[in-house]
């Protein structure tokens, strides 16, 4: 049975904007447009890094269309494809998604937003692991440009993520660069589990202001079913809470029902409906 869905529009907006803040890096900007937030990367045209988040526009047709034209023009001046990510609930206007689809946008993906509502399951997982006096599992935390082990750790983390998410091997170097970029940013850390020295599970934690966004949570396919994903997630949550985070959140792809159930089991709840990624065709 699915856990109750949270229906707080202010929380939904807070999470989407916080996610964008957690994805800032050197040169990447988050602009407050007054009626939405624009994430813009001058060096990378990938739509994921160039998107308008949580827009709030007039409901009347003419002002809505005028604002949409302005936003499309803004993306064009930045030499980017218009990419809009509405809220999972509380959109203004309420039929924002339908209007954008009618205006020529395509849904290229969708996910659900989840926020920690009960820390007890994660605390219990961590406590059970801490109670072990010996074992092959080791936990590493890489943050603030400081690695707890040798320089090869980033390669190991990228290899785990590439396997976990079936990423093209040619992109492994890009993954490694992204991993290193995370640890160079204040508040961003990579958590990794090793089993007898082999990297087996990874999670990324971005703690910004009073919240934490978790992402890139993955386990090597040949090591799944052993509780490693639960453990690395629980350790990331524990770190976030210890850092004083008032909220901890993550995103799950819409068609990944097992992942939703997995995170619900760790104390997370779904916020609103789906969050579509809309790209102008």
What name fits each language-model region?
Residues 91-107, 226, 230, 254-273, ...:
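Conserved active-site alpha-helix within GNAT-family acetyltransferase domains
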Residues 64-72, 216-221, 225-242, 261, ...:
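Conserved acetyl-CoA-binding loop-helix of GNAT-fold acetyltransferases
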Residues 64-154, 277-278:
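Acyl-donor-binding surface of acyltransferase catalytic domains
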Residues 170-220:
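A conserved beta-strand-loop-helix scaffold within acyl/acetyltransferase catalytic domains
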Residues 1-78, 91-93:
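N-terminal charged segments
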Residues 1-18, 53, 111, 125-175:
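Short amphipathic alpha-helix that is part of the acyltransferase structural core
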